[in-house]
Amino acid sequence: MGVSGSKGQKLFVSVLQRLLSERGLHVKESSAIEFYQFLIKVSPWFPEEGGLNLQDWKRVGREMKKYAAEHGTDSIPKQAYPIWLQLREILTEQSDLVLLSAEAKSVTEEELEEGLTGLLSASSQEKTYGTRGTAYAEIDTEVDKLSEHIYDEPYEEKEKADKNEEKDHVRKVKKIVQRKENSEHKRKEKDQKAFLATDWNNDDLSPEDWDDLEEQAAHYHDDDELILPVKRKVDKKKPLALRRKPLPPVGFAGAMAEAREKGDLTFTFPVVFMGESDDDDTPVWEPLPLKTLKELQSAVRTMGPSAPYTLQVVDMVASQWLTPSDWHQTARATLSPGDYVLWRTEYEEKSKETVQKTAGKRKGKVSLDMLLGTGQFLSPSSQIKLSKDVLKDVTTNAVLAWRAIPPPGVKKTVLAGLKQGNEESYETFISRLEEAVYRVMPRGEGSDILIKQLAWENANSLCQDLIRPMRKTGTMQDYIRACLDASPAVVQGMAYAAAMRGQKYSTFVKQTYGGGKGGQGSKGPVCFSCGKTGHIKRDCKEEKGSKRAPPGLCPRCKKGYHWKSECKSKFDKDGNPLPPLETNAENSKNL
């Protein structure tokens, strides 16, 4: 740039803010000063020897990268890389304004006047640059932009004299342009008057003069049609900023973007596909949010790895495309060492089952190394090339292995041994049953069938009798509604009733709730006379016709219609005590 010290810093900051503002980007002055000071530290040669050109700027980028490798990324300002990338893009476009601003301080008054004169002469000869008025307006615009680049930032008091001197220099340049414009305009008016004063009735001209005259006339009319009045704007408005690409991401996301450009895929997880298939687009890798990992670790620590909330967080993590290495890192970071060993064992077992199931069913064969991340798929860079189908199998096996981890302090039980207690509510039993089944197999039609079968077989006797009428046609919701009344209090009362009747608890339940229709069993009502089912006492035919009806009141007690031999009263109708019953022989004599 050829300028150092505070003056060079102000010039660089002014040019930097102007260039970025034209791209719709606003950089604070403090950030620009911080970047300039860092630039001097990294490239001390730049203020004196360098310039805003693509070659020098690429050299600055290489030195910044070398500085980061030696001192670490924390030593680099946060906005250093984004500013360097934006300026590199501007310099690649070879903007005339950038080149003019970069060399503004080295242009002398004579060189500027010669450049303006050359531009005026070129604009008057070529139509591609428009009219002379347009050319002058372009020159004024460039001079004004140059002035704004240099003087839009106020200097200190000690530099006011230099500022006024440079403003006078710009005024002189404008006066030179105005003087040349006036002289050119006067020359044109003179040619116009001479052209109008020509006697067109005089045909005494040679053919060469006629050709020259026609050429001049044609040239004159072309220029006359293109002449526009030169209007100098006093209050100039800044042009609207064009829409430009936003600044690249900063921080860890910016480092990830730069790493992807350079091919460094060490921390590329999880995998993000933007399309619906593998051919729609290339996969993009983003880091798993740290907040999600913290939430998962907190849930495991406070509620356990198999708690419903923890499993919900695991499902949220599983909604992304994670490789085997990502799942191992996540499980190792959140689970305890013992639970991690259990998870890894279950994951390997599920992966082997997946390989056996998918053998010969897919075009692309799924190997155990793909699912486990071993062998040729040991490195993360090789795992990111796995297809979506393989990543789905990896996620499914990882979630199933996580659900197989038993709660803290609970031993792994067999499903057949998971039975409902006598005083346990049916909905609590169903909750335990679902948790155990989902820990073994994923949610689906197979797990629903297994839960329904065990909900009937492993229920207690009371709930089985309530469910029996709807066992084949009802759903799990029907089972739960039927057993809502089977509370511990009801079970305790039925146990007391069975004990008072001298029956077993299961027999009493069958007689009371069998079939679930108001105490009628599956084979009909129970007869109180003979004890058989299928009829009641009044319809009992067991001893009908074998006994004769008593003729009247009992001769012994005088208060009942029964035979004397069947009398069991101890007092007669008057309250007198009765003697014991006579024997069969004495009774036969009385008859």
From Swiss-Prot:
The keyword Repeat applies. The keyword Zinc applies. One of its GO terms (cellular component) is viral nucleocapsid. Keywords: Capsid protein, DNA-binding, Host-virus interaction, Lipoprotein, Metal-binding, Myristate, Nucleotide-binding, Phosphoprotein, Repeat, Viral budding, Viral budding via the host ESCRT complexes, Viral matrix protein, Viral nucleoprotein, Viral release from host cell, Virion, Zinc, Zinc-finger. Residues 154-169, 178-193 have a biased composition (Basic and acidic residues). A lipid is attached at G2 (N-myristoyl glycine). A motif (PTAP/PSAP motif) lies at residues 305-308. It comes from Mouse mammary tumor virus (strain C3H) (MMTV). The lineage of its organism: Viruses, Riboviria, Pararnavirae, Artverviricota, Revtraviricetes. A zinc finger (CCHC-type) spans 525-542, 552-569. Pfam families: Gag_p10, Gag_p24, Gag_p24_C, zf-CCHC, zf-CCHC_5. One of its GO terms (molecular function) is DNA binding. This is Gag polyprotein. GO terms for biological process: viral budding via host ESCRT complex; viral translational frameshifting. It comes from the Viruses. The gene is gag. The record marks L99, L100, F195, L196, L228, P229, G254, A255, F269, P270, Y496, A497 as: Cleavage. Residues 154-193, 568-591 are annotated as: Disordered.
